[in-house]
């Protein structure tokens, strides 16, 4: 497991720790601007590259591959425990984006954290996830760890179709420069295995089941792009928000211009400020 830690140059008056669970295909190295913003304000920012992402390679496969969804949650816990030993007695805040938001939502114990922020999350049908997982398991028997263009298209293709006449990755980033940077990043993975999809579907199914009794024992802030198809253009994420709000009144939601990856799009400064304001409350 590869772990990135960004700390302020000074060690006095530290405000807290911010743990990031990043999104699918990307890695922690993409969060340098986020880290600069928050370390300059007295926070330590850290996070691990999720299994098979970035520098957290796996010997089982050369593409995006997860053997067991629970391993992603265990890695998140291990990263936190390591950093807390290094920087004890500081409040910890948790941020999950996209894939990372589902890792956060399936973590059984959030009590070590003071607040959580969920970005680009949504509500998926548990029944549909089971059907698709069964179908893929049969179709790709013996090829579960091999990259598949069809699996990639299954996971991302429908999002691009929501924006006719736009570039393929417009659903992810609206800014042309940001989109080129993403496409040209050699550590961003586009090769997805059937096993990865199946394990991710287990995480989404678990998060969907948990909506009946969501694990939101701490204050939660939902953030999403108004044109984000992953969040159901606001409909899916608001469904999750309402379930959380019923269990915990200390739950908020904010929307921003843009599509899915609002932390890296052209309006990222306003998202950073909203997070900083939330942490100060």
Residue ranges, per PLM feature:
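Short beta-strand element of the alpha/beta-hydrolase
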Residues: 14-23
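Active-site glycine-rich loops that stabilize anionic/oxyanionic intermediates
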Residues: 22-26, 98, 226-227
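Conserved alpha/beta-hydrolase
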Residues: 28-60
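Alpha/beta-hydrolase active-site loop
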Residues: 65-84
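Alpha/beta-hydrolase-fold enzymes
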Residues: 104-187
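Short beta-strand/loop motif that positions the catalytic acidic residue
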Residues: 222-224
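Conserved alpha/beta-hydrolase "acid-adjacent" motif
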Residues: 229-239
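Post-His helix in hydrolase/transferase enzymes
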Residues: 235-236, 263-277
